[in-house]
Amino acid sequence: MQVLHVCSEMFPLLKTGGLADVIGALPAAQIADGVDARVLLPAFPDIRRGVTDAQVVSRRDTFAGHITLLFGHYNGVGIYLIDAPHLYDRPGSPYHDTNLFAYTDNVLRFALLGWVGAEMASGLDPFWRPDVVHAHDWHAGLAPAYLAARGRPAKSVFTVHNLAYQGMFYAHHMNDIQLPWSFFNIHGLEFNGQISFLKAGLYYADHITAVSPTYAREITEPQFAYGMEGLLQQRHREGRLSGVLNGVDEKIWSPETDLLLASRYTRDTLEDKAENKRQLQIAMGLKVDDKVPLFAVVSRLTSQKGLDLVLEALPGLLEQGGQLALLGAGDPVLQEGFLAAAAEYPGQVGVQIGYHEAFSHRIMGGADVILVPSRFEPCGLTQLYGLKYGTLPLVRRTGGLADTVSDCSLENLADGVASGFVFEDSNAWSLLRAIRRAFVLWSRPSLWRFVQRQAMAMDFSWQVAAKSYRELYYRLK
């Protein structure tokens, strides 16, 4: 079984979000599972530099200009690169300029990505062609459409990592992207009078996956579907929509081997976690005290992530004696709010604006509770890292958060399945109730330790996801 992942980023070469973590780990897990998985990426500068052994496979003149297809390896995974400097050789973000304006030629930059993905199934590399083209998010959404236009030389899977990003472009660009105008149709890639790369993926793929079972259900409902609910309900009825939970890359996220921690530990040596907490308290300017629970946030600061609720609930958390360490960037109003809280409560609130991968490991190793109060969360990796590190996740019941964290209710504690704290409603009162439950559990150290060990024993390895995808691919054949 030969599978080509078509996507726009891959950890650690280039990362703007969780999509990169998935592509950085899933193909390697699939190879270990017996699937010949390769990845197709645009040759953005950081990616091009990282694939040092890239060789020319093919050269083509396309609707988006001249391209060179390269092939190399990274961490044992075969990588195809679309080398088109006029489209991809730009500093900074792959999606927008330094003023945060989307590049005006994004329609061509990402149509080309989909087109090359489909051409791979028609022999663009004469020595390897995929049985399945697996496209990820809107950037690769046209790959299933180009395959459909080509007579479907391969099966296609489209994975929704976040339905909120739709890749919308003016209709006149149909003239530029070499797809039949007949595709510009409500039964096709047209959405609200525009081209939707996301809808192209949803409509033309043989199968759609979402990154958790709950999110796969949620996106058939109007409040989560951004206008796509009709199509997604239809795909659900046809048995062509399912959820496959993301995994954790255990080579990178494991407290036993994590070199970024001051003190490594396992579920049997959890007392060694205390040194990480001490170091984190020092680094964040917090009072060094192992008796108080340290809550943490590692997140983009947006309302989707529910961080406004944390600000609102913060006085209640601090009154009970807790501490907060926050690492993140985003909405300027939220940034200011958290910085003001750090100034108002020195020693209790520590804030670092920005994102540092290394420091996120130190927070995960040192905190007692990781807060993930998202309004919606397709899968979420942060809570999975928390479980792995014995840093109990406090989450809202939505998307992948609902699939991965079990509340410390009395019955869950009795059944030995409790792994964190879960609240229902997207408001500060509901969040504070969950924070209160965390304090109650914290006051019973042996029970807290029991739940930590429970959480750390859970299996969210990529091997589980790789097996699910393999079974899906074989069903499509």
Curated annotation (Swiss-Prot):
This is Glycogen synthase. It comes from Escherichia coli (strain K12). Synthesizes alpha-1,4-glucan chains using ADP-glucose. One of its GO terms (cellular component) is cytosol. NCBIfam families: glgA, PRK00654.1-2. Pfam families: Glyco_transf_5, Glycos_transf_1. It catalyses: [(1->4)-alpha-D-glucosyl](n) + ADP-alpha-D-glucose = [(1->4)-alpha-D-glucosyl](n+1) + ADP + H(+). Pathway: Glycan biosynthesis; glycogen biosynthesis. InterPro entries: Glyco_trans_1, GS/SS, Starch_synth_cat_dom. GO terms for molecular function: alpha-1,4-glucan glucosyltransferase (ADP-glucose donor) activity; alpha-1,4-glucan glucosyltransferase (UDP-glucose donor) activity. Belongs to the glycosyltransferase 1 family. Bacterial/plant glycogen synthase subfamily. Its EC number is 2.4.1.21. The gene is glgA. ADP-alpha-D-glucose binds at residue 15. Keywords: Glycogen biosynthesis, Glycosyltransferase, Transferase. It comes from the Bacteria. The keyword Glycosyltransferase applies. GO terms for biological process: DNA damage response; glycogen biosynthetic process.
